Amino acid sequence: MNSNDQDPIPFRPEDNNFSGSKTYAMSGKIMLSAIVILFFVVILMVFLHLYARWYLLRARRRHLRRRSRNRRATMVFFTADPSTAATSVVASRGLDPNVIKSLPVFTFSDETHKDPIECAVCLSEFEESETGRVLPNCQHTFHVDCIDMWFHSHSTCPLCRSLVESLAGIESTAAAREREVVIAVDSDPVLVIEPSSSSGLTDEPHGSGSSQMLREDSGRKPAAIEVPRRTFSEFEDELTRRDSPASQSFRSPMSRMLSFTRMLSRDRRSASSPIAGAPPLSPTLSCRIQMTESDIERGGEESR
């Protein structure tokens, strides 16, 4: 018989089972490896998360520690002007009782006030024959009891916060704008030179024909001089106008007095010996007056 005529190998179920078990074993190993790798990845993520939290907390603690160290090392000093501090303390205490009493008071009635008026402190309307105060700056009205209680701890209007004391004290400020200065004038002998002619005013040798006489008053005579209060801006304006051409024709009495004082000091330096024929002057005499024609012309030009 030929080999081709032999019977084929019969199929055995055991061979199929062996191949299937081998496939299952391979897939099980792959699954186990994937689970292990995934487990390690999860562990790594958890570790990174914990490390990040630890690092951030450590950096925050360092920052807080550095800030606290800087606060301890830094010393801050505050200085204040005593006058400014006193002003702020007085302002926080409220208005003066005299200023509160000086505020105008009115009595509410339907005849005088047709429109209803509401008090901003107690939020109630005025009733018949109730008294109220009007603030001079903002013209706001309030009950007397309400606004007086408010002004014990405040110095501004409850509605617009405008100052009240600045306008309430206008009368006292205006009354104090002028001061009365009393100067005691020592009436020592004063030398008066009466020229006989216009040419007698020139510088001549002592003992000339001009008549000299001394006028004496006994005791002291008080002189009351009213000096108006002038602000710094007024003095500044006067200084700026002094060099202008218009200032040559108009000058204040103070500038005239200064010019006359300069003229007296110049004449006092020029006078070296007493006038002949005149009695000796007392030691308290301020100066000897010796006027010339040029001085009179100069004084006239300065007083214009």
UniProtKB/Swiss-Prot annotation:
One of its GO terms (molecular function) is ubiquitin protein ligase activity. The keyword Transmembrane applies. A zinc finger (RING-type) spans 119-161. The gene is ATL2. The chain crosses the membrane at residues 30-50. Residues 227-244, 295-304 have a biased composition (Basic and acidic residues). SMART domains: RING. This is RING-H2 finger protein ATL2. It comes from Arabidopsis thaliana.
